[in-house]
UniProtKB/Swiss-Prot annotation:
Involved in oxygen transport from the lung to the various peripheral tissues. The modification N6-acetyllysine is found at residue 16. Gene3D superfamilies: Globins (1.10.490.10). Signal peptide: none annotated. It comes from Peromyscus californicus (California mouse). Red blood cells. This is Hemoglobin subunit alpha. The modification N6-succinyllysine is found at residues 7, 11, 16, 40.
């Protein structure tokens, strides 16, 4: 459960992304594909090479979904319901992959915003991404 401090940290951190969300989303996906090659199996129709239009496009979708989540911290299940249905019933993504992408997102954010990436912000963003992952996998049962 996100505390009031966590929510404030997430909103502040997300606000500092500016117009870089899609860029960071694509970078995190690229990191995931490179570091965890088995994740590529969910994207057989993608050119998963660095900087491809498909990776950039999906990175933008990831960033948009997380921006939506950051704006609805008190109702993540409601805000992400359609996305949860998609991943559970149509895409059938192995839940562990959300943890892998979350890790890559944290690395990407830390690399771009080292001064703002304090231990408290790191912990809050980690809890936020874990909460999003839990919501996205909640309909797998």
């Amino acid at each position: 459960v996100l505390s009031a401090d966590d929510k404030a940290n997430v909103k502040a951190a997300w606000g500092k992304l500016g117009g870089h969300g899609a860029e960071y989303g694509a970078e995190a996906l690229g990191r995931m594909f490179c570091s965890f090659p088995t994740t590529k199996t969910y994207f057989p129709h993608f050119d998963v090479s660095h900087g491809s239009a498909q990776v950039k496009g999906h990175g933008a979708k990831v960033a948009d979904a997380l921006t939506t989540a950051a704006g609805h911290l008190d109702d993540l299940p409601g805000a992400l319901s359609a996305l949860s249905d998609l991943h559970a019933h149509k895409l059938r993504v192995d839940p562990v992959n959300f943890k892998l992408l979350s890790h890559c997102l944290l690395v990407t954010l830390a690399a771009h915003h080292p001064a703002e990436f304090t231990p408290a912000v790191h912990a809050s963003l980690d809890k936020f991404l874990a909460s999003v992952s839990t919501v996205l996998t909640s309909k797998y049962r």
